[in-house]
Amino acid sequence: CYNFQDFRSLAKSKLPSPIFNYIDGAADDEVTYRRNTSSFDDVSLVPSVLRGVKDVDISTTIFGKKLEMPVYCSPTAVQRLFHYEGERAVAKAADKFGTMFGVSSLGTVSVEEVSKISSSPKMFQFYFHKDRGLNNSMLERAKAAKFDVLALTVDTITGGNRERDLR
């Protein structure tokens, strides 16, 4: 793959259509999806020319942790729908490239297992549930697994109105 569209086409050819549409789709009329995607067309990557490239350093620091590159692997629910290793694969990739990744509280691999796979900085994305015991258990497990950051998701854990799926 040479660009985003190549990667998207490859995914569409390899994944069952319900899985592809889950990843590729969005809620309602997909207006925000189209805006987010088209925003990449508004960015120009302008190279610095006639400059040395011997010591290029794209590392950054976030939450007091050094990342080798300013790319973050965002948490996504039920990752094993998309790849047989799910969060394991993301943890390995983040570790290999020295960047941060997140694990959803709706993940398919335990926080304990993910923590053993990667020494990279990790974020636990937490959905608040009605069951306080479940909440406490998830938070304690993430803390014990040495997750660096907690992200509280405040929208909802119910699915959106995904019109593409209804069609």
Predicted feature locations:
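Short secondary-structure boundary segments
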Residues: S105-L106, V154
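Hydrophobic faces of well-ordered beta-strands that scaffold small-molecule active sites
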Residues: V71-S74, T99-V103, K122-F126, L150
